Amino acid sequence: MDMDQQLKTILRGSAEFIDEEELKKKLAKGRPLRVKAGFDPTAPDLHLGHTVLIHKLRHFQELGHTVIFLIGDFTGMIGDPSGRSETRPPLTREQVLQNAETYKKQVFKILDPEKTEVRFNSEWMDKFGAADFIRLASRYTVARMLERDDFEKRYRSNMTISIHEFLYPLVQGYDSVALEADVELGGTDQKFNLLVGRHLQSQEGQEPQCVLTVPILEGLDGVKKMSKSLGNYVGIDEPPADMFGKLMSVSDELMWRYYELITTKTLDEIAELQRRVASGELHPKTAKEELAEHITAQYHGSDKAAEARQGFNAVFAQGCVPDDMPEFSCSCGEDSTPPAFLADSGLAGSRGEAKRLIKQGALSLDGEKLDDPNTPLTAGEYVVRLGKKRFLRLIVR
């Protein structure tokens, strides 16, 4: 593949790239680039929003470059302050390592494990002593740190900034020195940290890494970023039917962004789909089904994805209730109030999310809308439907 084609693939769906001329010089050397992306395992599972970065790593992998999936087990215990209005509570080593194992299993649904270098930044950071940290801290000034947007806002609002939070971008930057990275990838909220890596590499006599940022993926609502706490996410490990159904709820406009950022479709294939929809040759719903099946197949295989599509059409196009809905039992009383059984069964992410959905009229029992979140259900068996795509067989004892 010639350089122009490589650049087109590399820049696909990117938000910003620093610096394109430097990248051309690196590519001209004809050796595989060392491409790094770091992930702090602060939660036990990944959702599709995280995979924007992983898909970009895959693009580099397909071009023959060395991909480094860096697990920030050391930085995870500090807590990334990026985009935070308050100090993030640090995790224990045990929590971080447990989450890291889950991450590895999930990312290899996208990346080729044979072509991926998995590293932990504790490999070099655990060897750092007090003198090493003081030397590292001397490489950056407080004034430069306060140029970072989230730090500046907190400083001007007289909100607490802990010293350890200043260390986070320095440690992340030093990771690039330790790995001799040619390129580092990150979300747009990581730009400051990525540039610190360039600065530290220059000071260590290394060729500064290029920086590529990817956009933050909007959640199912199309407004806010995908987040488990907001309930607008699709988890990588969700059952095929749930994943397919959630993806069918995105808007027609957001569908194309998902195609570009979190599928393996080529830009030419996506452009052809857009042309067919615009000409009326292909219905937008069919294009969305193709998207949902493609993404579901990435994580569950083509057979399960096809079954999910077939099941979706049986339930929603024909108004059927699925035969294989999950079953959940609870006791009469507090446990049988709608927010409780929705959250405890996993149908809703939390009791707060359940209450919001009930107020929006999203809950029905045996086909009847239910808008009272406070009254416990009496003993019996119910078919629960939450929104368009979530079903539950509820047994109250």
Swiss-Prot record:
GO terms for biological process: tyrosyl-tRNA aminoacylation. Its EC number is 6.1.1.1. The keyword Protein biosynthesis applies. The keyword 4Fe-4S does not apply. It catalyses: tRNA(Tyr) + L-tyrosine + ATP = L-tyrosyl-tRNA(Tyr) + AMP + diphosphate + H(+). Catalyzes the attachment of tyrosine to tRNA(Tyr) in a two-step reaction: tyrosine is first activated by ATP to form Tyr-AMP and then transferred to the acceptor end of tRNA(Tyr). HAMAP family: Tyr_tRNA_synth_type2 (MF_02007). This is Tyrosine--tRNA ligase. The lineage of its organism: Bacteria, Pseudomonadati, Thermodesulfobacteriota, Desulfovibrionia, Desulfovibrionales.
